[in-house]
Amino acid sequence: MKLWDILATCLLLLSSVSTRPLFHKLQPSKRAVVRSESPALDPIIDSQPETSNPKQASMEEQYDLTGLYPEQFEDVMDFIEATLGRLRRSSDVEPQMKRDRVRQKAAANTEKSGGRGRGERKRSRGRARSRDDRVKGQGRGCLLKEIHLNVTDLDLGYRTKEELIFRYCSGPCHDAETNYDKILNNLTHNKKLDKDTPSRTCCRPIAFDDDISFLDDSLEYHTLKKHSAKKCACV
């Protein structure tokens, strides 16, 4: 569309130049010749109406104008050729710019896809490590487990339909036993110690969940403290 707009502008300039009156460019010498020759005409001819003189003058002026057109045509043609040259150069540059933009977009998309791929691989490796940790943790002994219960199931004397997640510690602590624990266990097994000897190392909570409050069937509020384990260890 840009090329056609410029060509239409050039054609309008050309048509305006071809139809524009150029009386102000007439050569004064030719006008002087016409005036100097007019008194020498025959009286009979002078007696004729002067209506034919304007026609003759207009024909002469038109004849003179045709001599001036080539210069203006050359100017217009030079302008058109220069405009077409610029359009050719711009048409050669625009495809190259488009190709460069396409390459840049392709490179950006490749980098984005590569970044997403690396992120997904990192996340998959992280999930695999977490699964391995869970599998290994199952064999480490003392673990934190959970169960969904009703508050009434806790047998603390509350009658309510409120529910909670109860977390507890479970598992052996053989790996956490010290020589003291082993000696104590051996002496107890050989009945060389009294029955009131402290128990062995066991899996117990070392941190508890936040307190919870609930409304029982009698519309009374109650609060449970240190009711659920948050972190476990062999103690």
Curated annotation (Swiss-Prot):
Residues 1-19 form the signal peptide. InterPro entries: Cystine-knot_cytokine (IPR029034), GDNF (IPR016649), GDNF_fam (IPR043401), GDNF_TGF-b-like (IPR047020), TGF-b_C (IPR001839). Keywords: Cleavage on pair of basic residues, Disulfide bond, Glycoprotein, Growth factor, Secreted, Signal. Glycans are attached at N150, N186. One of its GO terms (cellular component) is extracellular region. One of its GO terms (molecular function) is growth factor activity. Residues 119-128 have a biased composition (Basic residues). Residues 20-87 form a propeptide. Homodimer; disulfide-linked. Interacts with GFRA1 coreceptor and RET: forms a 2:2:2 ternary complex composed of GDNF ligand, GFRA1 and RET receptor. PANTHER family: GDNF SUBFAMILY OF TGF-BETA FAMILY, GLIAL CELL LINE-DERIVED NEUROTROPHIC FACTOR. Belongs to the TGF-beta family. GDNF subfamily. This is Glial cell line-derived neurotrophic factor. It comes from Danio rerio. The gene is gdnf.
